[in-house]
UniProtKB/Swiss-Prot annotation:
Lipidation (S-palmitoyl cysteine): C112, C231, C329, C330
InterPro entries: Carotenoid_Oase (IPR004294)
Statement: the UniProt record of this protein carries the keyword Acetylation: yes
EC number of the protein: 3.1.1.64, 5.3.3.22
Annotated phenotype, changing T162P: In LCA2; uncertain significance
Full protein name: Retinoid isomerohydrolase
Membrane topology qualifier: Lipid-anchor
Known outcome of mutating T101I: In LCA2; severely decreased retinol isomerase activity
Known outcome of mutating R44Q: In LCA2; severely decreased retinol isomerase activity
Annotated source species: Homo sapiens (Human)
Residues with Phosphoserine modification: S117
Length: 533
């Protein structure tokens, strides 16, 4: 998996080009044979509009949200896409300029207003974006597109029409929520977001949304906070993108990438700033791992620590004989990886892309093992007694537990990211296989499968082809964990190729089963799901 491929033609730049939405679905040209059991829709979110008029967006997470759908029926495939009608998008289209500040792009007051109107507009408070470009997930019978703020957007998964905006603050105490909730098999949704806790200090709340009940009321209206995690810094919450969940425990990893709330509230309101301006790194903090008892709704005061890293995606978490196994896609060090995801960097020529990536934190897939039963008499000892891991947990004299990981995969500037597993059957349980998007100096150029027990890897890769996050779909009669297919949207700007296609791989060995080609470009997508018919 560590074989490095070069991209001198710069075809990856097509990932960051504005496209138009479609008025109706396109029929894709299929080569190979799509399994007849594969019936349903692949839904994906990402940016599709990278500028408004003459005003560009600057960061990868700024472009306006585009919702994509590949429909599978009786071996045929259609492709559809529509922009999500968020407030950010509608107002930008109406005023023909960027109206709401995005992750790395500031919105400025209407230049047509006089100086007094512009001055007072800064004191209206922080106007938070609802640009739902990151993920889509189910709540009850409904589907929501989301970013990482308090706003989520209800969409119609059949027509891709936007239905309404929902403010989570109207139901629970969170300032925002991640785009990676956990969905249990009964439909229960868990998520995490920071909040103001006791004495106005910052904390992190776990939100639970129940499954749809017999009364058919919106489950979001029945949301509740089930447990609260403390924050290591009273006024500077860590950036959190995902978390771990097992049948009995919740795992939260607190990294040194911090949000400076004073800067967020003051500079944003007074003279204009964006989200990226408000991040800073605590160079001395390292990483703290927190756990809570899910069933008893209780925070457990075990103090797990380790050396600094960035974290965006948990792979899986499970229980094993008194231990929690936590598998993560890490980036070494305390510097924020998002500093390297400005569009200007990603659109550079290949040699410059590599040069920039060499300065960034380096990726590594790691396994941490957290002992649940701590005996103070074991100070100085390794508490990990499992026979199948090299990870350690040393009980220190200050009663903290210092963790060292087992490395599952590591390659220089070769990341295994956007991980997926056989989620429905193995989330929170012992598992063997993970699927990931391979990033080559931040350029997505391969799909990977990792055996987390043996560290064996499989790779799909073709020249001038730029895939997306792999989505695993289990065979309806599966007998083994990896019985099924992997779906990925591939951008293919090379000569003699269609601009983009939906790739279907055998999940066993990543051999190609089929592809469904379309005659139009598809920009980068981040996350999504397969909705079975």
């Amino acid at each position: 998996m560590s074989i490095q491929v070069e991209h001198p033609a710069g075809g990856y730049k097509k990932l960051f080009e504005t496209v138009e939405e479609l008025s109706s679905p396109l029929t894709a040209h299929v080569t190979g044979r799509i399994p007849l059991w594969l019936t349903g829709s692949l839904l994906r979110c990402g940016p599709g509009l990278f500028e408004v008029g003459s005003e560009p967006f600057y960061h990868l997470f700024d472009g306006q949200a585009l919702l994509h759908k590949f429909d599978f029926k009786e071996g045929h495939v259609t492709y559809h896409r529509r922009f999500i009608r968020t407030d950010a998008y509608v107002r930008a289209m109406t005023e023909k300029r960027i109206v709401i500040t995005e992750f790395g792009t500031c919105a400025f007051p209407d230049p047509c207003k006089n100086i007094f109107s512009r001055f007072f507009s800064y004191f209206r408070g922080v106007e938070v974006t609802d640009n739902a470009l990151v993920n889509v997930y189910p709540v009850g019978e409904d589907y929501y597109a989301c970013t990482e703020t308090n706003f989520i957007t209800k969409i119609n998964p059949e027509t891709l029409e936007t239905i309404k905006q929902v403010d989570l603050c109207n139901y629970v105490s969170v300032n925002g929520a991640t785009a990676h909730p956990h969905i249990e098999n009964d439909g229960t949704v868990y998520n995490i977001g920071n909040c103001f806790g006791k004495n106005f200090s910052i904390a992190y709340n776990i939100v639970k949304i129940p499954p749809l009940q017999a009364d058919k009321e919106d489950p979001i209206s029945k949301s509740e906070i089930v447990v609260q995690f403390p924050c290591s810094d009273r006024f500077k919450p860590s950036y959190v993108h995902s978390f771990g969940l097992t049948p009995n425990y919740i795992v939260f990893v607190e990294t040194p990438v911090k949000i400076n709330l004073f800067k967020f509230l003051s500079s944003w309101s007074l003279w204009g700033a964006n989200y990226m301006d408000c991040f800073e790194s605590n160079e001395t903090m390292g990483v703290w791992l927190h756990i809570a008892d899910k069933k008893r709704k209780k925070y457990l005061n075990n103090k797990y620590r380790t050396s600094p890293f960035n974290l965006f995606h948990h792979i899986n978490t499970y229980e094993d004989n008194g231990f929690l196994i936590v598998d993560l896609c890490c980036w070494k060090g305390f510097e924020f990886v998002y500093n390297y995801l400005y569009l200007a960097n990603l659109r550079e020529n290949w040699e410059e892309v590599k040069k920039n990536a060499r300065k960034a934190p380096q990726p590594e897939v790691r396994r941490y093992v957290l002992p649940l039963n701590i005996d103070k008499a074991d100070t100085g000892k390794n508490l990990v007694t499992l026979p199948n891991t090299t990870a350690t947990a040393i009980l220190c004299s200050d009663e903290t537990i210092w963790l060292e990981p087992e490395v599952l995969f590591s390659g220089p500037r070769q990341a295994f990211e956007f991980p997926q597993i056989n989620y429905q059957k193995y989330c929170g349980k012992p598992y063997t296989y993970a699927y990931g998007l391979g990033l080559n100096h931040f350029v997505p150029d391969r799909l990977c499968k990792l055996n987390v027990k043996t560290k064996e890897t499989w790779v799909w890769q073709e020249p001038d082809s730029y895939p997306s996050e792999p989505i695993f779909v289990s065979h309806p009669d599966a007998l083994e964990e990896d019985d099924g297919v992997v779906l990925s949207v591939v951008v293919s700007p090379g000569a003699g190729q269609k601009p983009a296609y939906l790739l279907i791989l055998n999940a066993k060995d990543l051999s190609e089963v089929a592809r469904a080609e379309v005659e139009i470009n598809i920009p980068v997508t981040f996350h999504g799901l397969f909705k079975k018919s």
